[in-house]
A protein has these predicted regions:
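Flexible glycine/acidic-rich beta-alpha junction loops that bind and position SAM and/or redox cofactors
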Residues: 87, 211-222, 255-256, 277-288, ...
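Extended hydrophobic-aromatic, low-complexity segments
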Residues: 271-273, 285-286, 297, 306-313, ...
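Short flexible coil/turn linkers enriched for glycine and charged/polar residues
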Residues: 154-158, 168-170, 269, 279, ...
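Generic beta-strand/beta-sheet core signal
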Residues: 7, 210-212, 248-250, 276-278, ...
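Proteins enriched for Cys/Gly/acidic motifs involved in redox and nucleic-acid/cofactor modification
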Residues: 1-218, 228, 258, 263, ...
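Conserved SAM/AdoMet-binding glycine-rich loop
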Residues: 76-80, 85, 201-332, 338, ...
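Hydrophobic, well-ordered secondary-structure elements that form the walls
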Residues: 275, 317, 337, 345, ...
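Terminal RNA-binding accessory module
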Residues: 358-538
């Protein structure tokens, strides 16, 4: 029995890729290992968006040098965006790596692992570059393999990512994604619908639709029939079992009135919109080649507020210290953040990425210390706005999908919830996911199988129930109350004391305090209060 250890750095796309690779390898008889020592196959899923993410991967590879020397039979593979961009560099810097596989070739991983194990040597599978052939050939080389979902790899069984789009054609000057993920393509709507049904059958109550510019989603069938995001949301809305539908990350120019009206009219669709602005200066936006002006972004915000009203929650991304950014241009960003009053923002210092249009053409001339100061200043402005915004929730009752124990209880069940991972943008998330051998599931040969897991749907639901039962017994033995965490429909984090029996349910929570960017609450329904009282008396 082969054992796999997988480490993931990067965005939700990478987390989803890892989930699918694990599912594929489990079908080959693999189990998950908790650490590299107990694994015979080690995969690093990588990100190239920021230098910090690449440094994490090379740091991990450095630690694996000794492991490989002492255990040459172990297979080490690098997958994801770094693999697509730097395959030969990876082999030069870490010659003990056995395989390098780009994000569009993940279906080849099982075969390449076996080939490396039998034949030895180094093996590569990457997609065509953006200028390496005809457009259709390039697109086909970046297509992801059929979804095989592995719910035990998710932070919890109740929330799942669903890819609806791959690639990007925006070519922002700072961004490497169009090179590593390939041309923008919308998946067939029927494939998306079928996968959403699978996720609902597995117990997912909330799905998050993923795309580099997800609201640009477009699929044109052979009859020239167009399907856009608004059409897709309408269709997914009718799936039984799903309670919430979110989507990230959005592009400002494609936040159309039609899409906003669809969000308004479909109660399952979250009014949380992550729409990166990146800069409040037209001059900087032009250098970034973002494709819109500050005025157009303001118009978009006006459409959102007019259509969704107070229900809307908009978050954003910002890059400070981009090439040539002056004090005045940075101040324009500060002023616009104060004007737009985002729910939250993710703020990052610019770092030049080799292979992007900015590298070598635009000087990275803002000193690091200036970048750091601007990062801290803008973060302080945004945090003040977020805290003021959260004050408006005091005394209100909000519906919360309860994800699991908060970080205070994370040591015991540290794979149930990760607050940060579910809010950061596709471009900027750093996250490590490590498999848990206790959750490995054998493939079933029964007839009524879920296409996602290869297991009977009822059997999987029993697996989830068993996992919850074990967690409940652990807390009940300790006699402790548990601080739980969850999210509102508009993606605000809420923590409160309650019974673990509430995990996976959507409950009304009364908000009585705030702590930083977190809402503090208490259960308010008779049933939920009863569960809390039962927990206290046990």
């Amino acid at each position: 029995m082969h054992k796999l250890y997988i480490e993931t750095v990067g965005c939700q796309m990478n987390m989803l890729d890892s989930e699918m690779v694990v599912a594929d390898l489990r079908r080959q008889g693999y189990e998950l290992a908790q650490d590299v020592d107990s694994a015979d196959t080690i995969l690093l899923n990588t990100c190239s968006v920021r230098e910090q993410a690449e440094n994490k991967t090379y740091s991990s590879l450095g630690r694996l040098r000794k492991v490989k020397k002492e255990n040459p039979e172990k297979i080490i593979g690098v997958m994801g965006c770094m693999a697509q961009k730097d395959q030969q560099l990876i082999f030069r810097r870490a010659p003990y790596v056995d395989l390098v596989v780009g994000p569009g070739q993940l279906q080849q991983i099982p075969g390449l692992i076996e080939k490396a194990r039998v034949e030895g040597g180094q093996h590569t599978a990457v997609s065509l570059g953006r200028t390496a052939g005809k457009l259709q050939d390039i697109k086909r080389s970046h297509e992801t393999f059929d979804p095989m979902r592995d719910p035990t790899m998710r932070p919890n069984p109740f929330q799942a990512f669903l890819r609806i789009q791959i690639g990007c054609d925006k070519f922002c000057t700072y961004c490497i994604v169009p090179m590593t993920r390939g041309p923008e393509q919308g998946r067939h709507p029927q494939e998306i619908y079928d996968e959403a049904v699978i996720l609902a059958d597995q117990g997912a109550k909330e799905i998050t639709l993923l795309g580099q510019t997800v609201n640009s989603y477009l699929h044109i069938d052979k009859d020239k029939q167009e399907t856009r995001l608004a059409d897709l949301l309408t269709r997914l809305h009718d799936i039984n079992g799903l309670e919430r539908i979110k989507f990230v990350t959005s592009y400002p120019k494609d936040m159309t009135l039609d899409l906003l009206q669809t969000i308004r009219d479909l109660k399952k669709v979250s009014p949380y919109l992550h729409v990166p602005l990146q800069s409040g200066s037209d001059a900087v936006l032009k250098r970034m080649k973002r494709g819109y002006t500050v005025g157009e972004y303001r118009d978009m915000m006006a459409r959102i507020n007019e259509t969704l009203g107070d229900a809307a929650a908009v978050s954003s991304d910002f890059i400070v210290g981009f090439c040539g950014e002056t004090d005045a241009e940075f101040q324009e960003t500060v002023d616009l953040v104060k004007e737009c009053r985002f729910k939250n923002s993710f703020i990052f210092k610019y770092s030049e990425r080799p292979g992007t249009k900015a590298a070598g053409k635009l000087p990275d001339d803002v000193p690091f210390e200036v970048k750091r100061q601007r990062n801290n200043e803008l973060l302080a402005v945004q945090n003040k706005i977020s805290e003021e915004d959260n004050q408006s929730f005091l005394g209100r009752t909000v519906d919360v999908l309860i994800e699991g124990p908060s970080k205070r209880h994370d040591a015991a069940v540290n794979k149930v919830v990760n607050e940060e991972a579910q809010t950061k943008s596709l471009e900027d998330l750093d996250r490590v996911v490590v498999g848990d051998p206790a959750s490995a599931a054998k493939e079933s040969t029964l007839v009524q199988l879920s296409p996602a897991t290869g297991k009977p749907i009822d059997e999987y639901k029993n697996h989830v129930a068993d996992k919850q039962k074990a967690m409940l017994e652990q807390y009940e033995r300790s006699g402790e109350m548990v601080q739980l965490t969850g999210r509102t429909h508009c993606d605000r984090i809420v923590v409160f004391d309650g019974s673990p029996r509430l995990i996976g349910r959507t409950e009304p929570i009364g908000i009585y305090d705030i702590s930083g960017l977190t809402l503090m609450g208490t259960v308010v329904t008779d049933q939920a209060v009863g569960l809390v009282n039962l927990q206290k008396s046990s």
